[in-house]
Amino acid sequence: MAAGTVRGLAVAGGGESSESEDDGWEIGYLDRSAQKLKGPLLPEEKNETFKKALTTGDISLVQELLDSGLSVDSSFRYGWTPLMYAASVSNVELVRVLLDRGANASFDKDKQTILITACSARGSEEQILKCVELLLSRNADPNVACRRLMTPIMYAARDGHPQVVALLVAHGAEVNAQDENGYTALTWAARQGHKNVVLKLLELGANKMLQTKDGKTPSEIAKRNKHLEIFNFLSLTLNPLEGKLQQLTKEETICKLLTTDSDKEKDHIFSSYTAFGDLEIFLHGLGLEHMTDLLKERDITLRHLLTMRKDEFTKNGITNRDQQKILAALKELEVEEIKFGELPEVAKLEISGDEFLNFLLKLNKQCGHLITAVQNIISELPVNSHKIVLEWSSPQNFTSVCEELVSNVEDLSEEVCKLKDLIQKLQNERENDPTHIPLMEEVSTWNSRILKRTAVTVCGFGFLLFICKLTFQRK
């Protein structure tokens, strides 16, 4: 145990409180001065001395008590063992001594394992990592869950320990296991806002589409808890880091994740994501990441790419297959355009009422789509600039385009008002015109009445002639 003055509470891992506040341990200040047994002790005295030695982190006294015949798996009040206590305070040396003396690394108390206790301990990640590594080396099972079905990797993810997560996966931990609420390790990391853990889990093959019991994905959980960086990243169509370490062997994974401890490597864990701009993310989403260097060499931005014509694709060395993927994506993004050119010219007065009404309805629908699109963008944009995760060009470019949009909307509003006034004027003039021709509905109604009367009259005459002819034949 690291030198210090005060130790933390020894509580059950994962937030599951024990039946007593101290679980039978004396919580207080550490006295690091080594103690020795003054003489033979009674069994009750041995247990009490053992607890004090564990509490103070007195390794030599612990060893002396074990040498005197005290069991390394002694059960203290409420069922805790010495190893469980040592793991709960991340005392690496004490954990090592107890394991070397034969302590059971697979012990559990009411499904609370020592490995879970170590993963949820209150200590530095370095100390927790060493304790977890010792327990795993003694065959502690990383997939045994507590009463809430939470596994060690979920506790490590919840508490923000990416290296512990990686170590557990390297020893066979199931990265996509779900607890009683459907939470995975990724969901817990997203909920708590641990972006480094999120990225590490995605590298290790975590499934970001798994839902909780109430139907929420990790990205939605992140958004609900206001972790917008994580929400934006998890919302991408394809994550370039996904499954990056999944195919490595256990030894390769441990070597890669635990031996690179430099500051540069630690900084890289998130910069590998933030370095991606909008162009890179668009290409990765389509599986066209191989085009990134080509487009960057030619200084082609995403905006330029999305407005390219067929000949420009070919000229810039983009193959037909890649062209088809880009064009298909553009087709999905496009709002259905109104083909104004196909409508008859209003100026020639050849447009029918139905065609004109259809034109207005399409125009109104298009405006509705545009309003919804802008509202969605507003709701998704982060409030603070430091939460923007994509590389943006100068905000001045966006502002100038927005100003043009506002101007165009004002012009559109003015023209629509003119159109409305013109239609109202035509309607008023027609109603006051004495030469106004009745609508087809009115004419057809009058004609139908005449036709009905004529038909009845003809039928009547026909029936009368038939009776007369029949009477004449009988005579």
UniProtKB/Swiss-Prot annotation:
- The ranges of the ANK repeats are 45-74, 78-107, 110-144, 148-177, 181-210, 214-243
Pfam families noted in UniProt: Ank_2, Ank_4, SAM_2
One record GO biological process: regulatory ncRNA-mediated gene silencing
Q: Which PROSITE patterns match?
A: ANK_REP_REGION, ANK_REPEAT
Which parts of the sequence belong to the SAM domain? 272-334
Broad class of the protein's primary localization: cytoplasm
- What SMART domains does the record point to? ANK
The PTM Phosphoserine maps to S17, S18, S20
Its assembly, as annotated, is:
Interacts with DDX4, PIWIL1, RANBP9 and TDRD1.
- Official protein name in the record: Ankyrin repeat, SAM and basic leucine zipper domain-containing protein 1
Query: According to the entry, what is the taxonomic lineage of the organism?
Result: Eukaryota, Metazoa, Chordata, Craniata, Vertebrata
- Quote the gene name from the UniProt entry: ASZ1
